[in-house]
Amino acid sequence: MKIVFWGTPKYAAENLKTIAKAGYEVIAVVTQPDRKRGRGKKLSPSPVKEAAEELSIPVYATNSISKDQKTKEILLNLKADVYLVVAFGQILPKEILDQPKLGCWNSHASLLPVWRGAAPIQWSIINADAKTGICIMSMEEGLDTGPVIEQESTVIKDSDNLEILTNRLSVMSSKLLLKSLEKIKLTKGLNKSSRLKQLNAIEQRNLNGIPSYARQITKEDNLIDWNQDARKILKKIQGLYPNAYTLYNGKRIKILDAIISCDNNQSKESQDIKNQSKSNRIPGEIFMINKQIGIKIMTNDFPVLIKYAQLEGKKATDSYTLSIQSNLSINDKLGI
């Protein structure tokens, strides 16, 4: 079974490695072009391209597969049996979807139809969802609307940030793709309708969940608004890790790890602390700097305790060291 793998980030690269090491014949990889990355803005290949080169698999990079006639023709001539798509970053046109004999399949990191779109992992954390997962679906022209042949869920832990959850989902995705490929290869000779029937594909309208859209994350999304509730701020910090930031004297401070100092499931004493804090403090105000504990900042309800952070131009550090680097003081206000 000849496979063309489509993907771009590290998440997808791990899937590619798993499939190749399982003995499947990956005849080509399609990915996004090299981009400028990191502090030095050095031109670097995508993680999927790096993985493909390590595996000696031919790589084709394209800015827009819809407009890239040359790559389309190359792929057509490869006569692949299956296209596997994992976080590629572009919508595939119908002429591409129709090329492989055994179909075009996507591993999507959500419990469809919830969080269709480009950033499902981020939004599942930001939205404080109880769980998320992986769906393997047959691709069609709609955005992540195809019938699902495999699904697996995982609980989103309170301690999960984007990196931790992404790594866990990548492992789940790799396993589900292998399971799916074993079934897909048995559908040789069937048309699409018969193939989906044999694979017990389920239309998304028959799955649990209300359709929602996980739009691409923008630079503006990363800015923390201290006027929001503490839990909402915490979920943004976790869901956008390591990019959520605040401002102090015009400089960016990335907040890498934080906890809510008091939550609304605690005792009446905690509620009294909340009420006292709200009456005496304003959102964004620093009201504790402690070497052992960290920095406490007021929000719309409960204080947030910053544990690790990174000042613009500096390395990540504990928040007390950050307070020295940034010359932070009690009663200073973040977000300006």
Swiss-Prot record:
Record bears the keyword tRNA processing: no
Taxonomic lineage: Bacteria, Bacillati, Cyanobacteriota, Cyanophyceae, Synechococcales
One Pfam family in the UniProt entry: Formyl_trans_C
GO cellular component terms attached to this protein's record: cytosol
SUPFAM superfamilies recorded: FMT C-terminal domain-like (SSF50486), Formyltransferase (SSF53328)
Top EC category: transferase
InterPro entries the UniProt entry points to: Fmt, Formyl_trans_C, Formyl_transf_N, Formyl_transf_N_sf, Formyl_transferase-like_C_sf, Met-tRNA-FMT_C, Met-tRNA-FMT_N
Official protein name in the record: Methionyl-tRNA formyltransferase
Protein source organism: Prochlorococcus marinus (strain NATL2A)
GN (gene name): fmt
Family: Belongs to the Fmt family.
Function as written in the Swiss-Prot or TrEMBL entry: Attaches a formyl group to the free amino group of methionyl-tRNA(fMet). The formyl group appears to play a dual role in the initiator identity of N-formylmethionyl-tRNA by promoting its recognition by IF2 and preventing the misappropriation of this tRNA by the elongation apparatus.
Catalysed conversion reaction: L-methionyl-tRNA(fMet) + (6R)-10-formyltetrahydrofolate = N-formyl-L-methionyl-tRNA(fMet) + (6S)-5,6,7,8-tetrahydrofolate + H(+)
